């Protein structure tokens, strides 16, 4: 299941405090509406809707040596058997369920006075914080694969996204083979040589790098992205030095033991109502080569 399987459009804007506290699904809808705009975890990983049992998921990382058999198939002659083929099986790994959430209190006075704006701000802050944590964990998972040397890596000696010049003084224009998109093309070629069916569709960078890309390429950028079939996305948890190319259909998975859930309960001694929201994800990298990284040798400070 996804982060919020029953995700619905919340078009009424501000939440009615009493209605929300009586029916927490209203708050769930609001959090889901806010989160879906920036929920990176479901952008870079495929969502697996199968149930999670036992608080963990057993999975394996597939590399090119696991994708084909060690020996080749052979032609069969009449009356013969086909050749027995063998392959190296990847080692099983264990991903444990994580549990992230928070709660806030609404006083009876705020409820009675229908303090809508403060309540909506509290809900929005909780939604933003849960989203931030899930995005942070997604990028930490990707970065761990990079640090372990499992991803497709390219250290490029050409111009960085900040340094590239594609117009202006002809003497200052960066040669085509030294431009960042040349590095992107080389990564695509490397992935194709692996013959694993990888199709990168996300170009993931830091906010500053995204600004540099837009500034450098201007109106030519949409055409370049379309050429490669890429969507440009950014995250605060990406290092300015790194550019990620991701095939979300193959890179990894995210499952939820419990998706986005909101509950509320009375705290009669303090004459207030608690609102609690949480999600319990589990994620893992299943095909590290579906994540590529480009690191430019020269990068302006």
Each model region followed by its residue ranges:
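Sequence/fold signature of self-assembling virion shell proteins
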Residues: 2-11, 15-20, 211-301
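Structured loops at beta-to-helix junctions and adjacent beta-edge loops in soluble globular domains
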Residues: 62, 107, 206-208, 235, ...
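Assembly/oligomerization interface modules of large self-assembling protein complexes
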Residues: 28-100
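Intrinsically disordered or highly flexible coil/loop and linker segments, enriched in small
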Residues: 40, 44, 136-139, 197-200, ...
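N-terminal catalytic cores of peptidoglycan-degrading enzymes
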Residues: 1-54, 267-268
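Long, contiguous amphipathic alpha-helices that act as assembly "spine/axial" helices in icosahedral shell
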Residues: 87-151, 271-281
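Extended, solvent-exposed, turn-rich assembly/linker loops in the middle of proteins
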Residues: 147-228
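Short, well-ordered loop/turn elements at secondary-structure boundaries
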Residues: 100, 197-199, 239
């Amino acid at each position: 299941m996804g982060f919020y399987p029953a995700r619905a459009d919340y078009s009424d804007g501000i939440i009615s405090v009493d209605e929300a506290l009586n029916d927490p699904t209203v708050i769930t809808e609001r959090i889901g509406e806010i989160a879906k705009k920036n929920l990176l975890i479901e952008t870079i990983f495929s969502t697996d809707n199968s149930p999670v049992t036992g608080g963990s998921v057993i999975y394996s990382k597939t590399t090119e040596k696991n994708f084909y058999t060690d020996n080749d198939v052979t032609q069969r002659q009449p009356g013969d058997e086909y050749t027995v083929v063998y392959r190296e099986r990847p080692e099983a790994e264990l991903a444990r369920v994580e549990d992230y959430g928070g709660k806030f209190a609404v006083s009876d006075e705020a409820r009675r006075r229908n303090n809508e704006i403060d309540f909506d701000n509290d809900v929005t802050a909780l939604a933003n914080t849960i989203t931030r944590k899930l995005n942070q964990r997604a990028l930490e998972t990707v970065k761990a694969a990079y640090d372990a040397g499992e991803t497709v890596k390219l250290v490029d000696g050409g111009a960085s996204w900040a340094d590239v010049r594609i117009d202006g003084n002809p003497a200052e224009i960066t040669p085509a083979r030294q431009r960042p998109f040349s590095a992107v093309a080389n990564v695509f070629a490397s992935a194709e040589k692996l013959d694993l069916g990888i199709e990168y569709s996300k170009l993931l960078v830091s906010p500053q790098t995204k600004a540099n890309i837009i500034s450098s390429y201007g109106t030519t950028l949409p055409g370049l992205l379309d050429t490669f079939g890429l969507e440009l996305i950014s995250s605060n948890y990406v290092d300015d030095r790194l550019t990620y190319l991701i095939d979300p259909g193959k890179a990894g998975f995210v499952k939820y033991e419990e998706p986005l859930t909101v509950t509320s309960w009375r705290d009669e001694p303090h004459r207030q109502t608690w609102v609690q929201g949480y999600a319990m994800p589990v994620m893992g990298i299943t095909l590290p080569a579906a994540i590529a990284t480009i690191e430019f040798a020269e990068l302006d400070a």
